[in-house]
């Protein structure tokens, strides 16, 4: 499956890779559950491309809703980190619009809202290959200011 960037997108190094740790969502080396790549665009936006494998199956031949929600959580977290803050999810809400087939490449578009000193709101839209929105999410990410995670975000260029 092609998880290549669009023109003008630059690959991002996830903070867990910079730390030498793993991600519950996207550290599936064999691609059985999910393969994810993160990117930034020329305007500073954050994007993700992903494909779900048989280990993410819910309804026959389709991705489990929890797997979709987990991807949106991680992707919104990457967008929140792009602000230079060390954030964790405080609230996430997901609306499912259509099912996603296993093996189908999807794109996650992320948008930051107006942040406060301690909170970063993020919106995400997961789109199928034709551009149809399969699910949308909003999240509120809380700045925890942890030094160790801050160094990881800096090392990853976020």
Could you tell me what each predicted segment is?
Residues 70, 74-107:
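Hydrophobic beta-strand-centered segment that forms part of the acyl-chain substrate-binding groove
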Residues 39, 95-97, 109-113, 127:
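Conserved positions in beta-strands of structured domains
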Residues 1-49, 157-158:
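Non-catalytic linker/capping segments at the edges of enzyme domains
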Residues 1-16, 100-102, 113-158:
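HotDog/MaoC-like acyl-thioester-processing domains
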Residues 47-71:
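A conserved, well-ordered hydrophobic junction motif at loop->secondary-structure transitions
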